[in-house]
């Protein structure tokens, strides 16, 4: 599996190497995963693209490419994925997005993932009834702050509405993850929760759809 790009900072030689390795990984994706998930994802997005070409963005200096998808394995007892949205990640991983933003309209990106194997219990995707355009600050894992300075306790149903989705094996979800605050609930039971996923957005010239992870 690929190394996380945020660990490289701005070192161009390491970034070039990262992008080259990504392309090699993608060329061997059937061997790596036992199934051509990239073709499945690309075919799905092509049916939704309105005729636009769908592809993975090229790497720095046109060397290699971004990674098309990542697998996430969350083990029971190892917690959850805390509340976040795609737009807030641009502040945490600005080095990553600095290059991607040259070709891709990453703001308000769309998120997708496919459930490969759900946990025995827990692991639901929770979508909260607040958007990045209204709420842009994380106080802690259970508290957000909106643009009016009001605190939102995401554990309190009187403070915010939410929708929980439990996916079955093979289910794919596509949602406005750039704007919608969301989290993955704690994994319980004895089974790992295994998904693949990533993001999709228009190219800067609106002539293509790019997907990456």
Features from the language model and the residues they span:
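Catalytic core of Fe(II)/2-oxoglutarate
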Residues: 129, 137-213
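Catalytic core of non-heme Fe(II) oxygenases with the double-stranded beta-helix
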Residues: 76-167
